[in-house]
A protein has these predicted regions:
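Nucleotide-sugar donor-binding/catalytic module of glycosyltransferases
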Residues: 1-178
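C-terminal subregions of glycosyltransferases and related glycan-biosynthesis enzymes
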Residues: 131, 135-139, 156, 165-259
């Protein structure tokens, strides 16, 4: 009812897309991207709080990197992690998750995503390129796919300033994790199956990416996907040769032991 009220109040600004559920966050966002024609797109989760300058800062940065309309461009920002009452848990998501958002090469994005979808802006060229995807099932999340496309074919930029209050709670699909907390460390380091499954899904996504965009056999995505079934020694040599390491001590350790 709240949404309908806003539509009635601002009919020229708000359009309700009354579609049925598509099966989860990534499916919903891919569906929505396909329903709207606009020069720029920003995605939002229902319980996030946007700070006053979020749109202005993001749009200004977009305009500085978008020198051609046909170049896929992505801008994303820092977040402040808060609880359900908006009390600060961590000043920045980068600190909380041990992320390095300044490492934005295709090598890094194939291995690890640092883009949080509710902070990103994509231009039409990126939206169009993203929608070439052939099988959404083989992606991990829509924001990761956007990062891959922008890094491979266009430009990315990061704003090192929080533009959003990101609520951390049990309902987040892929929410923030306090990766440096002792409880996380003890629980995670020895979770061999979970770490290996995470790496497997990343290789599956890389294969889908290479197939969707018909990348050459010597491309990084193709070669990374081909690690599936290879020995640990082969995988570790590949990471070293291509400078592909996850950020954060614990992720790096998990990659070294089980990746």
């Amino acid at each position: 009812a709240a949404v309908e009220n806003y539509v009635e109040k601002y009919p020229d600004k708000i359009h309700l897309i009354d579609g049925k559920s598509t099966g989860g966050a990534k499916y919903n966002f891919f569906y929505l991207f396909g329903q709207v024609e606009a020069p720029y797109y920003m995605t939002c989760d229902q319980d996030d709080v946007w700070l006053d300058k979020k749109i202005e800062l993001t749009c200004d940065k977009m305009l500085t990197i978008e020198n051609k309309a046909d170049v896929p461009c992505l801008v994303y920002t820092e977040l402040r992690v808060v609880d359900s009452e908006l009390n600060t848990i961590a000043d920045t998501m980068s600190e909380y998750q041990s992320l390095d958002c300044h490492k934005r090469t295709i090598n890094q994005f194939i291995l690890q995503n640092s883009v949080t979808g509710c902070t990103m802006m994509v231009n039409m060229a990126l939206r169009d390129k993203m929608l070439h995807i052939t099988d959404i099932d083989n992606t991990i999340m829509h924001d990761w796919w956007a990062a891959l496309v922008a890094a491979q074919f266009g430009k990315t930029a990061f704003i090192d300033e929080p533009t959003i209050l990101y609520r951390q709670h049990g309902d987040n699909s892929l929410g923030a994790l306090g990766i440096n907390k002792l409880s996380y460390i003890v629980r995670r380091v020895w979770q061999k199956k979970q770490i290996q499954e995470s790496m497997r899904l990343g290789r599956l996504q890389a294969r889908e990416f290479a197939k969707t965009y018909n990348l050459p056999t010597d491309s990084l995505a193709v070669r990374y996907a081909a690690l599936e079934g290879k020995s640990r020694r082969v995988r570790q040599r590949f990471y070293k040769e291509n400078d592909m390491y996850k950020t954060g001590t614990m992720r790096r350790l998990g990659q070294a032991v089980w990746g």
